[in-house]
């Protein structure tokens, strides 16, 4: 979905075409099977929720979607001028998102006790029940106006000041995540903690290293595996692609890659990986984090666009 389509979906006019519900959620990672707990929020006046939905969609459109330059596939390196997207069955989020949605479907009517970790505004199309839109905000909406920095009073019927100590609910006019049908759009990396994808990233890293080893392009596979396993950024491995794996499978193209990265080859034409640095450079290359500038021949790191000294 392009930015233009995202703009046309999130706007004040579209809000009236949905039936809206609001839910608070809590997270308890000690419960491994179902860490999420949802609570249905009810309003004294039903018009309040529609009013909030309109305001939220208007502000998201103007202040979050408007400034971005593009919508891109999630690669763990948001440039701050783009919106990331993932299909909801992406292995990074699929399992936890399913658990999240399952918990939402079993929302409780009980009064919330303890700290709230966030809330969900869920809309179902009035003309097509299969068409939905979901806004997720990872922030506690319940706050106290009286705190260490301020004391708050309210005016009584007798025009006197009385200390106001009750908690209030503050719903933000921005969002961390928008899910439209089967695509999840993220404006920051808060979803990584929400869906606990660090564990999933670790599995992606392990699978990626196995794919690299399967190219049979290493003089000492065990040494490369050791160095690769010590590579600290799991998110780098998200962008591993078959095209670059195929390059190092091909002995002729492997020589070009080795020359670019200053990695030696043995007599059989296999990579000699004898340091963490060389392993890191090859990993970054295979995961599209390193490329060669066609004009200057400088070797650049994609996430920072800094020339590497290798």
Tell me what each language-model feature is.
Residues 2-57:
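Charged, amphipathic alpha-helical stretches
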Residues 33-302:
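Acidic, low-complexity, intrinsically disordered interaction modules
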């Amino acid at each position: 979905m392009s930015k233009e389509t995202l703009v046309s979906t999130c706007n004040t006019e579209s809000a009236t075409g949905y039936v809206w519900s609001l839910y608070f959620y809590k997270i308890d990672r000690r419960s491994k099977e179902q860490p999420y707990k949802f609570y249905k929020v009810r309003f004294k006046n039903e018009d309040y929720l529609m009013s909030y939905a309109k305001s939220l969609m208007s502000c998201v459109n103007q202040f979050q979607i408007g400034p971005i330059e593009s919508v891109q596939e999630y690669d763990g390196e948001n440039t701050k001028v783009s919106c990331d997207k993932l299909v909801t069955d992406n292995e990074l989020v699929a399992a936890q998102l399913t658990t999240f949605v399952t918990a939402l479907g079993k929302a409780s009517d009980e009064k919330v006790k303890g700290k709230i970790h966030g809330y969900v505004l869920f809309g179902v199309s009035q003309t097509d029940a299969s068409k939905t839109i979901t806004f997720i905000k990872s922030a506690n909406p319940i706050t106290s106006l009286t705190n260490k920095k301020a004391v708050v009073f309210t005016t009584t019927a007798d025009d006197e000041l009385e200390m106001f100590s009750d908690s209030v609910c503050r719903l933000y006019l921005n969002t961390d995540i928008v899910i439209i049908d089967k695509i999840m759009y993220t404006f920051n990396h808060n979803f990584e903690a929400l869906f606990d994808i660090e564990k999933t990233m670790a599995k992606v890293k392990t699978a990626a290293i196995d794919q690299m080893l399967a190219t049979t392009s290493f003089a000492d596979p065990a040494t490369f595996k050791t160095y690769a396993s010590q590579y600290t950024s799991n998110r780098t491995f998200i962008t591993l692609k078959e095209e670059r794996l195929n390059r190092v499978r091909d002995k002729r193209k492997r020589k070009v890659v080795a020359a670019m990265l200053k990695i030696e080859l043995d007599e059989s034409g296999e990579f000699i990986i004898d340091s963490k640095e060389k392993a890191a450079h090859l990993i970054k290359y295979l995961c599209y984090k390193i490329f060669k500038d066609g004009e200057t021949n400088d070797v650049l790191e994609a996430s920072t666009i800094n020339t590497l000294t290798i």
